[in-house]
From Swiss-Prot:
Biological processes annotated in GO: positive regulation of DNA-templated transcription
Gene Ontology MF terms in the entry: DNA-binding transcription factor activity, RNA polymerase II-specific; sequence-specific DNA binding
UniProt keyword Transcription regulation present: yes
SUPFAM superfamilies: Homeodomain-like
Disordered: annotated span: 180-254
Oligomeric form and interacting partners: Homodimer. May form a heterodimer with HOX4.
Species: Oryza sativa subsp. indica
GO cellular component labels: nucleus
Annotated compartments: Nucleus
Expression tissues: Expressed in seedlings, roots, leaves, nodes, internodes, flowers and embryo.
Protein's name according to its UniProt entry: Homeobox-leucine zipper protein HOX5
Job of this protein: Probable transcription activator that binds to the DNA sequence 5'-CAAT[AT]ATTG-3'.
UniProt entry keywords in alphabetical sequence: Activator, DNA-binding, Homeobox, Nucleus, Transcription, Transcription regulation
Length: 350
């Protein structure tokens, strides 16, 4: 037997045989894992179970060597006891009690921590850790709540701002509209005045229109109506009389010239009457006396071509002369009718 293949180990013998008997280990053709020195020795006898050795050496991070001292074994057992335990889950009753305690006071005092741990059957350190995590979550939720509140306030302010802008635009439009209406109202009287003046300019004068539309003589011998404001002379029947006098009874008054056409009414121009106010005023100033129309038998009377006789004072004679100078003359010929009418009209307007 090869002495290099015989090993005596009391430690291995004690672990293999709890009774404390010593064992001789004979080498042989063991596995390659046992090394060249322990070839042929079963792994179970040597106490080299891979599962056990790997679990015991997991904390050290490397496989424990075969030869170890007593101090190393004690240190290994100490570290196995200090291995972290599995995380425990809290029950629903514990969570509810912790939540109520946190709502009452989120700060945890030592006396309160001990009392909660005793009531809940938990370690004081576990209670402290739960409160710390709960405060962190509460701060996060508080920030979220503050953000939501500030965002809602911002949205409300933005809506109010947009509403104010809309009201401002509406009021500005109303101001512009009212200003335009006011300007139109201010300019409308002046335009109306201009329009009225233009209409007045376009419309002819009443006297002019009446004079332009009035005929002063007709072929039938009738005189048209005079324009407004013109004093109507008396009719020849009222003036031509044998003993006509004025209101004072002294024979003074306006001189009247009557042209009477008794024959050929269709061929001659007939003048009904003519009233000379200027001659009357001159006569009243001069007090020349009373002159009246007389028949053709009276002495000093002037007899017309048609058989009418009348007396004329000096002023009336002058007016008659002017009337005659204007060309108003009686003719028996029908071809001179138009010339006589034009001459009489020119004298009337002069």
């Amino acid at each position: 037997m090869d002495p290099g293949r015989v090993v005596f180990d009391s430690g291995v013998a004690r672990r293999a045989c709890p009774g404390g008997a010593q064992m001789l280990l004979f080498g042989g053709g063991g596995s390659a894992n046992s090394g060249g020195f322990f070839r042929g020795v079963p792994a179970a006898v040597l106490g080299m179970d891979e599962s056990r050795s790997s679990s015991s050496a997991a904390g050290a991070g490397a496989k424990r060597p075969f030869f170890t001292t007593h101090e190393e074994l004690l240190e290994e057992e100490y570290y196995d006891e200090q291995a972290p335990e599995k995380k425990r889950r809290l029950t629903a009753e514990q969570v509810q009690m912790l939540e109520r305690s946190f709502e009452e006071e989120n700060k945890l005092e030592p006396e309160r921590k001990t009392e909660l741990a005793r009531r809940l059957g938990m370690a004081p350190r576990q209670v402290a850790v739960w409160f710390q995590n709960r405060r962190a979550r509460w701060k996060t939720k508080q920030l979220e709540h503050d953000f939501d509140r500030l965002k809602a306030a911002y949205d409300a302010l933005a809506a109010d701002h947009h509403a104010l802008l809309s009201d401002n635009d509406r009021l500005r439009a109303q101001v512009i509209s009212l200003t335009e209406k006011l300007q139109d109202k201010e300019t409308s009287p002046s335009s109306a005045t201009i329009t009225t003046a233009a209409q007045e300019v376009d419309q002819p004068d009443e006297h002019t229109e009446a004079a332009s539309t009035t005929g002063f003589a007709t072929v039938d011998g009738a005189l048209a109506a005079p324009p407004p404001g013109h004093q109507q002379p008396p009719h020849k029947d009222d003036l031509v009389s044998s003993g006509g006098t004025n209101d004072d009874g002294d024979g003074g008054g306006a001189a009247v010239v009557v042209f009477d056409v008794t024959e050929g009414a269709n061929d001659r121009l007939s003048c009904e009457s003519a009233y000379f106010a200027d001659a009357a005023e001159a006569y009243e100033r001069d007090c020349a006396g009373h002159y009246a129309l007389s028949s053709e038998e009276e002495d000093g009377g002037a007899v017309s071509d048609e058989g009418c006789s009348f007396d004329l004072p000096d002023a009336a004679a002058a007016a008659a002369a002017m009337f005659g100078a204007a060309g108003v003359v009686h003719h028996d010929a029908a071809d001179d009718e138009e010339a006589q009418l034009g001459s009489w009209t020119a004298w009337f307007w002069s």
